[in-house]
Amino acid sequence: MVTYSANYSTSFQKRSPFAVHNRRSNMARMDFNNIVGDPFALITISTSLIAWLLSFATCVISDIQGAFPNFAWWAVGYMLCAIIGISLVLASQTSHVYGVAIVGYLAAGLTFTTLAVNSLIYDDQASKQAGAAGFILQSMVTIVWIFYFGSSSQTSSRPYLDSMGAGKEHPSYRNSKPLSTNYGARPETVVSGNQPPQMYTSAQLNGFETSSPVSGYPPTAANGAENGTQNRFVGPAIGSQSNLGGGSTLGADHPSTPNEVSQPTVYPYRAKAIYSYEANPDDANEISFSKHEILDVSDVSGRWWQAKKASGETGIAPSNYLILI
């Protein structure tokens, strides 16, 4: 019997630590076209900057004219840092990575701007009232940002806002995981040309026999339980074998052909990419796709989906990068 060790299976292979380090060491690339090409990012950042300049200028004038609450200066400085940080995150398209931290910072900023409004709006001095108006406008933008960054990608509003900039967005954060990174071993839905089939002997499969035979491979009583087990477990993994007679064994007469494993021909589902993904160069089964790209999907069970691109390229894609449409 010709058998292959489990080490040949891609499910048991461990990636090189150097390859993992190289993939994780890729930093996000800054591209301010992601802001210019996204109406939501452009409008909110522009509005927040105008509101900040209004509050800063009026606070300077109010401080020159007379007594001024020092707490308002802290709100001015804090919101400037928040606006710069959000601009960098949107420019690098890493909102799914830093979204939780951004919501926390914005919640604190909303508190500061609200207290600054309370300190300035009731004063009779016109410059202080104008400063309060600037803080009110910043608070409104902050509320919108909290809703955006705090919303999950599964909501209807987040993909809609992200789709506004689909024409000019570029994949900038290499292979970052927006949700869970604990995938573990995934099923091999496509067999690579350079990978031998995963097969085991009857001794290795002892205790895993099924009570009923696999369709198309009936066990024969004349050959005993061992040959029946071999027919059930080894036979289906070889696409080139169409007939296994009684007493047949895997040898030179029945060569294995791993490339003949059929791929799905029906893709009943359609999915939209909510993040860009670059396939692992060490795994020929994965496919790359860009944000907002539409893919045809054959199976939506599990963490990796068998997908087909518009160009006809097929492979597997991580399910947490896709949303069904």
From Swiss-Prot:
Q: Which UniProt keywords apply?
A: Cell membrane, Membrane, SH3 domain, Stress response, Transmembrane, Transmembrane helix
Show which residues sit on the Cytoplasmic side of the membrane.
1-40, 92-96, 151-325
**Where is the stretch described as Disordered?**
160-182, 236-263
GO CC list: plasma membrane
Give the primary localization class. Answer: membrane
Identify the SUPFAM superfamilies for this entry. Answer: SH3-domain
Topology in the lipid bilayer is annotated as: Multi-pass membrane protein
| Membrane-spanning intervals of the chain | 41-61, 71-91, 97-117, 130-150
Q: Which segments sit on the Extracellular face?
A: 62-70, 118-129
Which Gene3D superfamilies would you find in this protein's record? SH3 Domains
Localization per record: Cell membrane
**Which ranges are annotated Polar residues under compositional bias?**
173-182
Domain SH3 as annotated: residue spans: 266-325
The record lists its disulfide bonds as none
Q: How does it assemble?
A: Forms homooligomers.
Tell me the protein family, please: Belongs to the SHO1 family.
What does this protein do, in the record's words?
Plasma membrane osmosensor that activates the high osmolarity glycerol (HOG) MAPK signaling pathway in response to high osmolarity.
Protein name as it appears in the record: High osmolarity signaling protein SHO1
Please state the gene responsible for encoding this protein.
Answer: SHO1
